[in-house]
């Protein structure tokens, strides 16, 4: 899959790309963000992330544990637990 050009729009690069158990893609971006994609249509899922990244995720990326894009019409964002 050729996803790096898509992430380049946000000045991001894929640092690690792994197919897990032949079921889903695990991506680690150079800014530390972890992204999960389904095996089918990963570019459509990345487009969904690109649509909201600048407005929603970019300013909070250090607090995000992962973004899961394996849903048909949305995504899940898991935030890291705060240590007090």
Q: At which residue positions do the language-model features occur?
A:
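Charged, solvent-exposed interaction patches on well-folded alpha/beta domains
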Residues: 1-84
């Amino acid at each position: 899959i050729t996803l790096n050009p898509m992430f380049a729009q946000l000045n991001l690069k894929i640092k690690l790309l792994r197919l897990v158990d032949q079921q889903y893609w695990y991506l680690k971006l150079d800014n530390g963000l972890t992204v999960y994609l389904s095996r089918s249509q990963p570019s459509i899922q990345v487009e969904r992330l690109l649509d909201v990244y600048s407005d929603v995720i970019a300013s909070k990326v250090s607090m995000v544990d992962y973004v899961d894009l394996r849903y048909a019409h949305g995504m899940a964002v898991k935030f890291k637990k705060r240590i007090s």
